[in-house]
Curated annotation (Swiss-Prot):
GO terms for biological process: cellular response to heat; protein quality control for misfolded or incompletely synthesized proteins. The gene is lon. ATP binds at G357, P358, P359, G360, V361, G362, K363, T364. GO terms for molecular function: ATP binding; ATP hydrolysis activity; ATP-dependent peptidase activity; sequence-specific DNA binding; serine-type endopeptidase activity. It comes from Syntrophomonas wolfei subsp. wolfei (strain DSM 2245B / Goettingen). It catalyses: Hydrolysis of proteins in presence of ATP. Its main location: cytoplasm. This is Lon protease.
Length: 812
């Protein structure tokens, strides 16, 4: 609002200011760089050299609008312009008087406004005089406290007689926020302006007083530190004269005694003494002294010569292994062999074993049992997800917070140089720009190198040759070949159903009853119940999920016992739905009838073996092949090879030309959501194709596995034990295997061998002889589900002579 009787307006270019406010009666430099601002300056220079200065509400706004600018500003006169590099300019302006925006007249090429002058009234009163004196006194005290304002400024301020001008000049010298300065600019009442400025000045002096006290306190602390350092040096000199030892000397002497008693190798001892000499020469407060002290602590905490005595009693060790784990004969046998050799040969390098098997078969817990059976310390290190090489070898001491790798950290924890060291999930490591931890493990797991294992932090060799390293993995395919070559692979296959029943009865059920606070008198499981849990509620090679299901039943029984509903519960097979709900898995069983175009194969998965039905249908077409069931590339190629073989043997199989050339073949493997791959279904595919194209049914009690070539040769496959166990579980009477897999039959449990007839075959002709039913065996009017026999085709088959290959079977 104007303070004069007549309102005075001016039309002026406007310069929006960012982060700065110009008061009347002040001279200030402004750096101008925005295009519109430069245009406003240039236009003002062409006229009266007056320009309106208004501050933006937000300094970050590059292109301010009307609502982004405070309405009250200062009319200033341009005194000087200096053009700077980059198209900017430095402008010297002098504030003249307050003004308020009345209207915006233009926005381009610069902002032009009509402003209303707000000149101060020239009045005098006792109250105004008192306020001015108080403000001047406060300002003088502020100048003395801040020491940032020249004393000459006080002289010029004291000479000001107008209250409004006094407030503006003093406000321009204070370090205030923009909103506080803007309020001073907007206060047209001089008394209110002086009062508000006195309040702000009082707050600023309080802040300065606090800063002064803080500075004094910091200075005293620094003086105290320097004084303490000086006194310590004096104490050292006095103690030296008296022949006494100071704290640093005592620490150094303690380290020296520990190094002598550590019984370290010569090179490690020399390194330790060298670092101790460095520590002795360093001032106590130097940061490097802490690094050296930590380094010496690490060296002295490692078990350079400490060993635990092995328990060489083979019977006791075997009893411990059998107590903790059922089955697992191969790894147990290998551990006992190691004990026997240790008993005969005192000096022997520790073995490096790799236990490979599906989840839940007891690989990790077996490592702990090995440590217990040998009487050694046990250390476990999980490698899953590790991608930094420094996790194995440590960080160099040049890095802040460096420390040894997890190998030496484990050795420190063990406190002996011959622990059982379990490297869990070695197939789950990854690599990135920080290095490859698998490559770093080569030195750890190589018996020819690990006796001089060098950690980046220690930089001295440490002997790992007496450590018994055991690694675990679910698959060897993800382990780098050089690393795999350094380990002794022991495969732990899945448990049979009989094994799982035995483990559940003797281990899992008693364990869960105890963990849930129950007693054997509260709950019992029948054998049929355990079998149904295994078949319908779990699908795994191990027993982890089986234990989980048993625990679920125990929880429900525990609740019943607490609620006094039942004090004894017998978990019967027919009551499982009440405890666990409906079965989750389809239990694979053999086909009940002989069918045309349907053959039973065997599959090997991470959860063990399973049976695999293969279905073939013929459709009129052009001889094309269609494959469904989410098959992998290898399996698709096996199907193509099987079809080629069957077509090449069309005459011998009694397949007429029309069926061979004018019918499309559709091969489907059920459970289409599950990916399937591998070459071992080759002979099963060929059998199903031969059956569909010849019209001869396939025996439903026969399962088979093997890779086929175009000439009909049968190549060996993997997972023999798991596949035969799956066939036994499904009720298969006969299994056909490649003759080259005869060596794998030694792993098959004797009870399974007695119940299944194992036939070794080397050529596809032998497979067809064992699987396809001769047409003479078909009873008149008998029908085979799945594919209807073509009467004409049957007639042709009956009239053709079949080539019967000589039997070349190896029965087991």
């Amino acid at each position: 609002m104007p303070t004069e009787e007549h309102q005075t307006y001016r039309e002026l270019p406007m310069l929006p200011l960012r982060g700065v406010l110009v008061f009347p009666y002040t001279v200030i430099h402004l750096d101008v760089g925005r295009k519109k601002s430069i245009n406003a300056i240039e236009d003002a220079m062409l006229g009266s050299k007056e320009i309106f200065l208004a501050t933006q509400k937000e300094a970050q706004t590059d292109e301010p609008d009307e609502e982004d600018i405070y309405e009250v500003g200062t009319v200033a006169e341009i005194r000087q312009i200096l053009k700077m590099p980059g198209g900017t300019m430095r402008v010297l302006v002098e504030g003249l008087f307050r003004a308020e925006i009345n209207a915006y007249l233009a926005n381009d090429p610069y902002m032009k406004v009509r402003v209303e002058e707000l000149r101060d009234k020239k009045i005098k009163s006792p109250e105004l005089e008192a306020l001015m004196r108080n403000l001047v006194g406060q300002f003088e005290q502020y100048v003395r406290m801040s020491k940032k304002i020249p004393p000459e400024t006080v002289v010029s301020v004291v000479a000001i007689e107008e209250g409004g001008r006094l407030a503006d000049v003093i406000a321009s010298h204070l370090n205030l926020r923009i909103n506080e300065k803007q309020r001073i600019l907007e206060l047209s009442d001089i008394n209110k302006r002086l009062n508000y400025l006195c309040e702000l000045l009082a707050k600023e002096m309080e802040v300065l007083e606090l800063e002064r006290k803080i500075n004094i306190r910091v200075r005293k602390q620094m003086e105290k530190t320097q004084k303490e350092y000086y006194l310590r040096e004096q104490i050292k000199a006095i103690q030296k004269e008296l022949g006494e030892k100071d704290e640093r000397s005592s620490e150094v002497e303690e380290f020296r005694e520990r190094i002598k008693k550590a019984n370290m190798p010569k090179d490690a001892e020399e390194k330790a003494f060298k670092e101790l000499e460095r520590l002795e020469k360093m001032p106590p407060m130097v940061a490097e002294a802490v690094v050296v002290r930590n380094y010496l602590d690490w060296i002295l905490s490692l078990p350079w010569s400490l060993e635990t005595r092995d328990r060489l009693d083979l019977k006791a060790a075997e009893a411990i292994l059998d107590e903790d784990h059922y089955g697992l004969e191969k790894p147990k046998e290998r551990i006992l062999e190691y004990l026997a050799i240790r008993k005969l040969a005192k000096k022997m390098k520790g073995p490096i074993l790799c236990l490979v098997g599906p989840p839940g078969v007891g690989k990790t817990s077996l490592g702990k049992s090995v440590g217990r059976s040998l009487g050694r310390k046990f250390i476990r290190m999980s490698l899953g997800g590790i991608r930094d090489e420094a996790e194995i070898r440590g960080h160099r001491r040049t890095y802040v917070g460096s420390m040894p790798g997890r190998i030496l950290q484990g050795m420190k924890t063990a406190g002996s140089k011959n622990p059982v060291f379990l490297l869990d999930e070695i197939d789950k490591m990854t690599m990135d720009f920080r290095g490859d931890p698998a490559s770093a493990l080569l030195e750890v797991l190589d018996p020819e190198q690990n006796y001089i294992f060098s950690d980046h932090y220690l930089e001295i060799p440490f002997d790992l040759s007496k450590v018994m390293f055991i690694t675990t993995a679910n698959s060897v395919f993800n382990i780098p070949r050089p690393l795999l070559d350094r380990m002794e692979i022991i495969e732990i296959t899945g448990y049979t159903e009989e094994d799982k029943v035995h483990i559940a009865t003797d281990y899992l059920v008693p364990k869960q009853i105890k963990e849930h606070g129950l007693k054997e008198s509260n709950i019992t499981f029948s054998e049929g119940t355990l079998r149904r849990i295994i078949r319908e509620y779990t699908r795994e090679a191990g027993v982890r999920n089986l234990e989980r299901q048993i625990a679920s039943i125990c929880r429900k029984v525990a609740r019943q016992v607490v609620e006094d509903k039942d004090t004894f519960v017998h978990v019967a097979s027919n009551s499982l739905n009440r405890f666990l709900g409906a079965g989750r898995y389809r239990y694979g069983v053999a086909e009940s009838e002989n069918q045309v175009g349907v053959a039973t194969g065997l599959a090997w998965t991470e959860s063990g073996g399973d049976i695999l039905s293969i279905e073939v249908a013929l459709l009129k077409g052009k001889g094309n092949l269609t494959l469904t069931g989410k098959l992998g590339e290898v399996m698709k190629e096996s199907a193509q090879a099987a079809l080629t073989y069957v077509r090449s043997k069309a005459d011998e199989l009694g397949i007429n030309d029309e069926i061979r050339d004018k019918y499309d073949v559709h091969i489907h493997i059920p459970e289409g959501a599950i990916p399937k791959d591998g070459p071992s279904a080759g002979i099963t595919l060929a059998t199903a194709l031969a059956s569909a194209m010849s019209g001869l049914p396939v025996r439903s009690d026969v399962a088979m596995t093997g890779e086929i070539t175009l000439r009909g040769r049968i190549l060996p496959i993997g997972g023999v034990k798991e596949k035969i166990l799956a066939a036994h579980r499904a009720g298969i009477a006969k299994v056909l295997l490649p003759v080259e897999n005869k060596k794998d039959l030694a792993e098959i449990p004797a009870p399974v061998k007695r119940k299944i007839k194992l036939v070794l075959v080397s050529h596809m002709d032998e497979v067809l002889e064992e699987t396809l039913l001769k047409l003479e065996a078909i009873q008149p009017g008998e029908d085979f589900p799945g594919v209807l026999l073509n009467p004409e085709l049957v007639g042709e088959n009956l009239n053709q002579d079949r080539v019967e290959p000589e039997a070349n079977k190896d029965l087991c």
